Structure formats: C-alpha cells, structure tokens
C-alpha cells in the first residue's frame, strides 16, 4: 500500500512537472532573460530545434527545424538522431530564425541533462554557426570532428576491417540509402552546402 503525503505543508507539483515535461524554476529564469529561447529537444531517432517566445496566451514558435527535414528536403542519408544531424538541425533552425530577423536567443534544453558534447549542444553549435547570438560556454560544444561524424566514419572503417558481416548489419540503413558510413563527413558537408544554398549561401 502506497502512503500518501498529508499535512498542511504538502504541495502537489504542477501537472507538467509531474509528467517530467517542464522544469518551472528553469522556465522562470528563462523568462527573465527577455529573449526568445532556442528549444533543443532530442528523441532516440530525431532532433528538434525551435525558436520559441513567451506570450501571455502561451508560447509562440517563431522558427523551427526537425531532423526528418534533412532527409526529405536536403537528401540526408545518415541517421536522423546522431550528432551531425543534430548540428544540421540547429543550423537550419538558426538560418530560418535569422531570415525572420531573430538574431538573439537563450538555450533551453528542458529536462535533458547538460552533458558536454551532447546532441542538444550540437544543435546550439549549429545555431551559433548560422550566425545567432546565444550565450554559452565553449566547453559544452561538441568538437568539429564529432560534428562532422568522424567518430562514426572511424568506427565504420574499424568494423569493416575486423568483421565485414557486422559492418553490413550495423550500418545496413546507411548502405540501403546509398551511403558508406565511412564517407559520412563528406556527406555532411554536402548536405550543409545544400542548406546554405536554400538561404542564398555559396
């Protein structure tokens, strides 16, 4: 039998806090920043970046990008839930924000743990490289080689040399889409260039 908390001091947490969706203390601090938020969220297979502003009637999304767009619109053949895809999602969101005249934001990672080099910070790095001004510490950003997927390419080369069958099994989705995983860094640059072209870049 579960004992229920009782007494005058007991306070029921807000529903979204109980559901693990909102940290209201962090949300209040973000409101004080008086700037839109770069909301970075990740799932097992995808990354989502949004520029969101507070409003009395509820949050307003000013610009957004979803990693599935990388595949459907820009020909991304890698996994949509990895670090390179997270960076490109943040980059795309940042360019869309700038196109709408939004230059400054604060990072909002929600209830995700602030792990250095994680996908939420790869999205931050993408938005920064797009040209946005977002306060941050350099130490949380993933290194360039990880953003480009060098770690995935190196792992693929090693497995291919040691166990070709395991290589075929582990990277089957890459191969089905016509991409050798060891060529992911070059593919990353190709997709990034396509995104830049969408916004008039070279």
UniProtKB/Swiss-Prot annotation:
User: Which Gene3D superfamilies does UniProt cross-reference here?
Assistant: 3.30.420.100
GO CC term (a single one):
cytosolic large ribosomal subunit
Which GO molecular function annotations are given, in alphabetical order? 5S rRNA binding; structural constituent of ribosome
GO biological process: any one? ribosomal large subunit assembly
Question: What keywords tag this UniProt record?
Answer: Ribonucleoprotein, Ribosomal protein, RNA-binding, rRNA-binding
Query: InterPro entries, from UniProt?
Result: Rbsml_uL18_euk
**What is known about what this protein does?**
This is one of the proteins that bind and probably mediate the attachment of the 5S RNA into the large ribosomal subunit, where it forms part of the central protuberance.
Give the record's subunit note.
Part of the 50S ribosomal subunit. Contacts the 5S and 23S rRNAs.
Similarity field? Belongs to the universal ribosomal protein uL18 family.
Can you name this protein?
Large ribosomal subunit protein uL18
Output the lineage of the source organism: Archaea, Methanobacteriati, Methanobacteriota, Methanomada group, Methanopyri
């Amino acid at each position: 039998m579960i004992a229920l908390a009782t007494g005058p001091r007991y306070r029921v947490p807000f529903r979204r806090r109980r559901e693990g969706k909102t940290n209201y203390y962090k949300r209040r601090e973000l409101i004080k920043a008086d700037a839109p938020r770069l909301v970075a969220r990740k799932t097992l297979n995808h990354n989502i970046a949004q520029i969101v502003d507070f409003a009395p009637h509820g949050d307003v999304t000013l610009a957004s990008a979803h990693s599935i767009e990388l595949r459907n619109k820009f020909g991304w053949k890698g996994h949509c839930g990895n670090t390179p895809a997270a960076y490109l999602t943040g980059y795309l969101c940042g360019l869309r924000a700038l196109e709408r005249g939004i230059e400054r934001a604060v990072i909002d990672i929600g209830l995700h743990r602030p792990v250095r080099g994680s996908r939420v910070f790869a999205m931050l790095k993408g938005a920064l490289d797009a040209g946005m001004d977002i306060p941050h510490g350099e130490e949380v950003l993933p290194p360039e080689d990880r953003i480009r997927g060098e770690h995935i390419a190196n792992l693929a080369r090693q497995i291919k040399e040691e166990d070709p069958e395991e290589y075929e099994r582990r990277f089957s989705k890459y191969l089905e889409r016509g991409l050798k995983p060891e060529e992911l860094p070059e593919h990353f640059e190709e997709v990034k260039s396509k995104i830049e072209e969408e916004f008039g870049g070279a």
